[in-house]
């Protein structure tokens, strides 16, 4: 697609599933953007079972020149939903916002498209953001961005992107990136983007954009990132967390092997992930998950760390396993009392 063929300069991807309480807020925050260039919203509802679909259909009827609602299909999952939307985008640049998050700066798109138009070597621009507690409505900072220069050589960010565990180096819902670079990367290696065993859609996009050029940063808050309810990445269920951590780390491992990235930092990261998986398996007392940790060690080509080996000894016998679970329960109870 050449520049003259772009119907809209910007495409905004919105994924949603069972978010009837928040999707209106999300769409309104995008529709109120003040931008000198046209933009579209590509809306992907993943077969919601509540009223989300009806709300999306209503918005698509009210704003037919802006919102394109993807066809209703059986549950795709977040990966296929995202990249189906991406391939449907008609814009030169792509932004996105999840169906429970929302933008808080009406000039977000204007600021970002201006940077991309004026800096052809910049592949992605992103901003600062805040956590938003759905219950209390309070906002909290995610911490300092380690790459806070106006423009950074993306190659300097690769290792940090691969090994991120807490604050994402680039929060994709704050970002805008070049569609042509993304489409080429997708065509060159569709496995990186469509493999269901990788579990997320954003890390690989951020990596590719950093690998292919410079990253611009705007130190202004444009996004409130919702939390306070269970999601794929936020769950108190140890089994669900085990699966999520395993899949996202599979992606990091694939990227490291594909792009020949190997350092003490990446090795330590994979070891820490093995320990994290071990503890998830320990807490939910699941022998199958425990065995899967060794499979991950082999796949990621990393030795199980000493602290995980100690946990393995405890978990080798159900008597000791149950005993240490009981001891842990006591300590957790004491910590809870002390916090009051």
Question: In which residue ranges do the predicted regions lie?
Answer:
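Short, well-formed alpha-helical segments that are part of the catalytic scaffolds
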Residues: 19-32
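Glycine-rich, basic loop-to-helix element that forms the pyrophosphate-binding segment
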Residues: 72-89, 111
